[in-house]
Amino acid sequence: MKIRFYRSSDREALQAYQLTDLRFTNHPKEAVADLENRYAIVGLEEDQIVTFLILDAGEKKYTYGGQPDSLLLRNFSTDEDFQMRGYGSQTLKLLPDFIREHLPMYKSIILGVNERNQVASYLYRETGFSKQPQRI
């Protein structure tokens, strides 16, 4: 598995991305409509998009205690056809090194997690995130 920045050539693949439970996130095709101060990241397994997330460098991060060198992780999802295979965990584990390499001006990741989203909370804890900013 690998992660990389979203490309406009991914647009068609995002149309086919299966995500029906939208209680806690937007569909990726909606999330890429506004990328001002945001970085869209896709997780790939054999060139198939299996995960998606936004790293938001805008003002919203301050709502969660972010600093100028923080990124707010939002809109994180796994395509329903690929859930329960570890792709979400792998994506989160690859993310700190990806940021170090491609966005070195940022030093921490802020999570804005709805308390009712127990699956996300568990996933973040299991991949080393805590209630404090994740230092990278």
Walk through the language-model features, giving the residues of each.
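Active-site acidic-Proline motif in GNAT/NAT acetyltransferases
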Residues: 79-85, 115-116
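Acetyl-CoA-dependent GNAT
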Residues: 5-75, 79-81, 92, 98-102
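Short, well-ordered turn and helix-capping elements at secondary-structure junctions
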Residues: 57-59, 77, 115, 133-136
